[in-house]
Amino acid sequence: MKKLFFSLCLACFVLGTAVAQLKTPEQFLGYKPGDRFTPHHRMVDYFEYVAAQNPNIKLIQYGETNEKRPLILAILASPENMARLEQIRTDNLKRTGLLSGTPSTQVPINWMSFNVHGNESVGMEAAISTFHTLADPNNAKVQEWLKNQVII
């Protein structure tokens, strides 16, 4: 009976760990980014999937294309920085002189832009891979980076 209980606990742990792993772009899309053109809706699907897995990611639709495709940005931050996102934003405006006052935080905002022209696919492919790297909660180096900055 103890062996059966132990086996069940071990199976639950292994399955729970496997489920908790973030799918890579290749696993999600069925091909490695850059090997094929990724349609816009699949990129949005992947960003939404990753954001649903990680509470430290916020997706914002800031507009749409002429073809009514959503234009989105992803905000990645540590839990502490995500909780004070508005303060960090206004402090950055104060540092640039766009708002008056003295900043109370020293957290920079790192804006990463990938696409300038809609018909150039390399930016979207790079964005998908970079987003996965930055969103992976098991990447200790990135988690350390996110303590010191907000990435958009």
Outline where the language-model segments fall:
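Bacterial N-terminal signal peptides
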Residues: S7-T17
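Structured catalytic-domain cores with a bias toward divalent-metal coordination
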Residues: A20-I152
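Positively charged n-region of N-terminal signal peptides that target proteins for export
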Residues: M1-L4
